[in-house]
Amino acid sequence: KAPTDPKDVVRFVKEVPYWTAKKHGKKYRLMYQVYTHPKYIEHGKKFFEGVNERYTEYAKRLEPKIGIPYTVITPLIFIFVRACVHYAMFEDEYYLKTQMEVLKQGVALFADKYRSQYLRGGNDK
């Protein structure tokens, strides 16, 4: 389950890719084959529209807790999920580690940026 406490995020981010690979790797490989097939591509698009909506709603719930706008959090979630799914399908440790490192640095930079704006009383983006 996704964390709602910022203190739990680091543990979650470290564990989820490996848990996802173990729990869902085979299923993701099958879904990839099916949803990229021309006969089923429209079903795949609909599936991912729902995924996009769910992650956006989650980002909106996180915004007041971590102080980063949901419009910034949402693409970070997408990068995280893509890295997890890619790892689950291909067990590509290099891809996973590089994506996680850029996410870690990105979140820290965004947190500093929006904390500074908040302290200055501004909302400039």
Which sequence ranges carry the predicted segments?
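Generic alpha-helical structural signal
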Residues: 11-15, 45, 49-56, 100-104, ...
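Hydrophobic alpha-helical connector segments
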Residues: 1-23, 77
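Amphipathic alpha-helical packing segments from all-alpha helical-bundle domains
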Residues: 19, 23, 32, 39-67, ...
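Short amphipathic alpha-helical interaction patches enriched in hydrophobic/aromatic residues
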Residues: 2, 39-42, 85-88
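Residue-level recognition of alpha-helix termini/interfacial anchor residues
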Residues: 23-24, 90
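Hydrophobic/aromatic-rich alpha-helical bundle segments in the mid-to-C-terminal region
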Residues: 49, 62-110, 114-125
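Short linear capping/connector segments at secondary-structure termini
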Residues: 2-3, 7, 32-38
